[in-house]
């Protein structure tokens, strides 16, 4: 698939949220995120900048209830955008990983754009919230990206003290791992990177 076509626009409207998201995999890290959840916007900004993705997200939701529905649906849309933008996934490097330090915290993410969704998150947090985002949601957000992006995603905080730093390390590592996994390997000549011939 030519790099110029690796974009996607997703709209999701439910009784709980209204979301518009646009992704350009082959971007330069331009970000416009307005979800109503400041810490989530911060993480999406870091994710896209470290992955060099162009990302635009405008979301409104039932934040008078809590942040769960809005944060979850944004990550559902993000996963769907990657799946749509990658098409048949021809020529992809496909698998990649990244370690990212954030001060005293170290995060690790490995991804396989296999078409088979699975997610493992190994991270312990000591505070219930970082900003407006519950730390109990972090694993669920990564799961939403993995399931709807049809990718195998493993994320781990190896160590750290500050929960903000831990989450930041994970989102940066996810951006960098996906940047590498979505690159085109010219040696494949546009072939699907699987012995099955399909992803």
Curated annotation (Swiss-Prot):
Any Pfam family the entry gives: IGPD
Entry's Gene Ontology BP terms: L-histidine biosynthetic process
Gene Ontology CC terms: cytoplasm
Keyword Lyase carried by entry: yes
EC class of the enzyme, as a word: lyase
Keywords, sorted A to Z: Amino-acid biosynthesis, Cytoplasm, Histidine biosynthesis, Lyase
Location relative to the cell: Cytoplasm
Protein name per the record: Imidazoleglycerol-phosphate dehydratase
Organism: Roseiflexus sp. (strain RS-1)
Gene encoding the protein: hisB
């Amino acid at each position: 698939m030519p790099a110029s076509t690796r974009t996607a626009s997703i709209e999701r409207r439910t009784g709980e949220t209204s979301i518009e998201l646009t992704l350009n995999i082959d971007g330069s890290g331009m970000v416009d995120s307005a979800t109503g959840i400041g810490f989530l916007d911060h993480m999406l900004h870091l994710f896209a900048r470290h992955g060099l993705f162009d990302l635009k997200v405008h979301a409104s939701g039932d934040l008078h209830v809590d942040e769960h529905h809005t944060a979850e649906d944004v990550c559902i849309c993000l996963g769907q955008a990657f799946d749509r933008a990658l098409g048949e996934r021809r020529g992809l490097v496909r698998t990649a990983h990244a370690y990212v330090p954030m001060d005293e915290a170290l995060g690790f993410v490995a991804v396989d754009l296999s078409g088979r969704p699975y997610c493992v998150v190994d991270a312990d947090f000591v505070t219930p919230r970082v900003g407006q985002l519950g730390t109990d949601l972090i694993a669920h957000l990564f799961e939403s990206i993995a399931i709807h992006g049809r990718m195998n995603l493993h994320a781990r905080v190896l160590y750290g003290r500050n929960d903000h730093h831990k989450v930041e390390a994970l989102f940066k590592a996810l951006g960098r791992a996906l940047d590498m996994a979505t690159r085109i390997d010219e040696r494949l000549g546009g072939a699907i990177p699987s012995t099955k011939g399909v992803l």
